[in-house]
Amino acid sequence: MQEIVFNALVHGVYVVTTRLEELVNGMTAAWVSQVSLQPLLVMVSIALPRYSHHLIKESGIFAINVLDNTQADLGKRFGYKSGRQVDKFAGLPWTTAATGAPILPQAYAYLDLKLKDTYLAGDHNLFLGEVVDAKILHPQNQPLVFKKSDFF
């Protein structure tokens, strides 16, 4: 019953990217939220065993790439397999943000973040990031919305 209600919650769809030296990875996420305006803080919830979890914790940087409503396939590309086994960036254009985190130039928008704090929340960690830079790349598009189990 509770899982059914949980699936009724609607979220945006994001690709959270990070970099640790030469290792780059990204994962699809829906549990992203604004936290504060002063300073500008955003959080993402990531399961403890995830490869991105390890890289963010070690590097202290990450970016949130906001997908648009035509990019469901991009969300699936970053959502189904672990970066431990697959290079999710193979063949994709990407740039580097001020922090060094990968940015997907085809995304609707991005936020470049420096890890400020980490909070254990059950089987996930909440990574609290301070915004270093943010930009809407394609304002003519609309953000992609996640329902039920589209990408996970």
Task: Show which residues each predicted segment covers.
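Basic, polyanion-binding surface patches
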Residues: 1-152
